[in-house]
A protein has these predicted regions:
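Substrate-binding/catalytic cleft of secreted carbohydrate-active enzymes
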Residues: 7-12, 20-171
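Active-site mouth loops of central-metabolism enzymes
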Residues: 1-3
């Protein structure tokens, strides 16, 4: 995409009151990261992939490449060790080998590094987890596929999340 389109995308996100983006399903285009840097959109930079973890030798090479490419972008405030069940905890230490800032490494759909990021928690489960000491930051929200379509709506989740000081939003 062009520089202008990347800027337009970031402005569109900010116009929807978003202050961060997870790069799991968004290409890690250097122009997009430049737009995030200049316009103030925080970034969770995530190893690509879908649902299966990388073996350690492959993961090490991918982490090294991702961090060497993206390390100088101030908008990146978290590294993510893969989508859903696609992470390999043996790789966690690799992130800090290449990042002199030692930004937090998180695992979407898990509880690591003080962040509770589990995908698709029900409304009741979310209430319980917000009482724990970890920062509550779901990286995907529940939808009808998992609760038969009878769960709380996004508005209900946001209202609940606003009341808890350890909840910092979601993706």
């Amino acid at each position: 995409m062009s520089k202008e389109k990347n800027i337009e995308d970031v402005l569109l996100m900010k116009g929807m009151n978003m202050n961060s983006v997870r790069l799991s399903h968004y290409p890690a285009d250097p122009e997009f990261l430049e737009a995030c840097d200049s316009l103030g959109l925080y970034v969770m930079d995530e190893l690509g992939g879908w649902h299966g973890k990388y073996d350690t030798p492959t993961g090490v090479r991918l982490i090294e490449g991702m961090i060497e490419r993206d390390v100088n972008h101030p908008s990146i405030i978290w590294w993510s060790n893969g989508n859903e069940k696609g992470w390999n905890t043996e790789l966690d230490g690799e992130f800090h080998k290449y990042d002199p800032q030692k930004r937090p490494v998180i695992h979407p759909q898990g509880n690591f590094s003080g962040f509770e990021t589990m995908h698709y928690r029900s409304y009741g489960e979310s209430q319980n987890y917000m009482r724990l000491p970890e920062i509550f930051m779901p990286t995907e929200f529940l939808h009808g596929l998992y609760d038969g379509g009878h769960g709380a709506g996004l508005y209900d989740y946001w209202e609940m999340m606003r009341k808890h000081p350890r909840c910092i939003g979601g993706f």
